[in-house]
Amino acid sequence: MDQTDQTTHFGFRDVPLGEKQTLVNDVFHSVASRYDLMNDLMSGGLHRVWKDIMINTLNPPKSDAPFALLDVAGGTGDISFRAAKKAGAGFHATVCDINGDMLEVGRQRALKQYLDDRVSFVEGNAESLAFPDRSFDAYTIAFGIRNVPQIDLALAEAYRVLKHGGRFLCLEFSTVEVPGLDKLYDLFSFNVIPQLGRAVTGDAESYRYLVESIRQFPRPNAFAEMISAAGFSRVSWQTLSGGIVALHSGWRL
């Protein structure tokens, strides 16, 4: 069965598997220039806290020892910049994203922050990474894996490119656990976020998709099983902010 015969979800719509990546690309082409501003508005700045927790969990070495990070779906560079500022002189991050517009925003940000010698940008597909086996000490993906058409392939690639002892970290939206907060969160997500998107980027539909894609993503226990199935060991997760997001971890051992 080829991709024209298979379907997957794009938000709440079913689409041919081969079309999802193009549709996702269109979303991020549309919002790239205002993506970071919208993250602040949508989360009330909480995304900064969640990303700091991710980097503290990664804990890149502060020594001169070489440490190679692959930040997939890293687009505008937020995760890599945070890691570079925390790490020692031996650190280098490679941001890999399928969307050239997002990468260009990241390159400009790297120049402004004088991090262009420590963070590089490569256009590529999470399902088929153009890196040799066992190339990286860590693999991060923040708010990106739910947009990948075939998540199992992305996880297999993450495992392949990690060195023995390498760590996989994934920050992704999850299922709200606090009674009452779930209803408020839905109200904000489906009614406010698309209108914020319209006001800031001129595009409500892209943000409607992003909200819908959160609801379609597996619950933390189900996603943890997918991580384990890809070969990772010591798989765990922690929920943050009442379950709005989850930080998943696994090791190649």
Swiss-Prot record:
Keywords attached to this entry: Menaquinone biosynthesis, Methyltransferase, S-adenosyl-L-methionine, Transferase, Ubiquinone biosynthesis
Biochemical pathway: Quinol/quinone metabolism; menaquinone biosynthesis; menaquinol from 1,4-dihydroxy-2-naphthoate: step 2/2; Cofactor biosynthesis; ubiquinone biosynthesis
Name of the gene encoding the protein in the UniProt record: ubiE
InterPro entries, sorted: SAM-dependent_MTases_sf, UbiE/COQ5_MeTrFase, UbiE/COQ5_MeTrFase_CS
Stored CDD domains: AdoMet_MTases
Gene3D superfamilies named among the record's database cross-references: Vaccinia Virus protein VP39 (3.40.50.150)
GO MF terms, alphabetically ordered: 2-methoxy-6-polyprenyl-1,4-benzoquinol methyltransferase activity; demethylmenaquinone methyltransferase activity
Class of this enzyme: transferase
Entry protein name: Ubiquinone/menaquinone biosynthesis C-methyltransferase UbiE
Keyword Cell wall biogenesis/degradation attached: no
Recorded family membership: Belongs to the class I-like SAM-binding methyltransferase superfamily. MenG/UbiE family.
GO-annotated biological processes: aerobic respiration; menaquinone biosynthetic process; methylation
Keyword Transferase: yes
Species of origin: Bradyrhizobium sp. (strain ORS 278)
Alphabetical list of SUPFAM superfamilies matching this protein: S-adenosyl-L-methionine-dependent methyltransferases
EC number: 2.1.1.163, 2.1.1.201
Catalytic activity: a 2-demethylmenaquinol + S-adenosyl-L-methionine = a menaquinol + S-adenosyl-L-homocysteine + H(+); a 2-methoxy-6-(all-trans-polyprenyl)benzene-1,4-diol + S-adenosyl-L-methionine = a 5-methoxy-2-methyl-3-(all-trans-polyprenyl)benzene-1,4-diol + S-adenosyl-L-homocysteine + H(+)
Binding site for S-adenosyl-L-methionine: T76, D97, N125, A126
Function field: Methyltransferase required for the conversion of demethylmenaquinol (DMKH2) to menaquinol (MKH2) and the conversion of 2-polyprenyl-6-methoxy-1,4-benzoquinol (DDMQH2) to 2-polyprenyl-3-methyl-6-methoxy-1,4-benzoquinol (DMQH2).
